[in-house]
Amino acid sequence: MASIMATYAQDFATKWELEAQNKRDLDIFDNLSDRLIEFGMISARHGVLFNQKDKHRLIAILEFKDAEAYKNCMELIEATDWNREINRVERLESYVIDAELDA
């Protein structure tokens, strides 16, 4: 069965807001990571947009071993209090991995 990838992108008005939420998200994710791995998450990446003037974006890319792992992990993620008091525009997109290139 194909793996599933979920991407979370968050856009902020200021660098300060991005940095404040970034710290919160990473601390919360660190507390969840063992359970997510147990539920079938196989990789996680996190990044900050660079080389774009006046754009403040975070992205998280999570990969799950299959659709069942995706479902179980997303239930945990969605039930978590991510402390969303800082304004942002958020997008979640999910994909079936149909091709991969490992260098």
Regions found by a protein language model. Give the residues of each.
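Short S/T/G/P-rich N-terminal loop/turn motif that feeds into the first structured element of a domain
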Residues: 1-75, 92-103
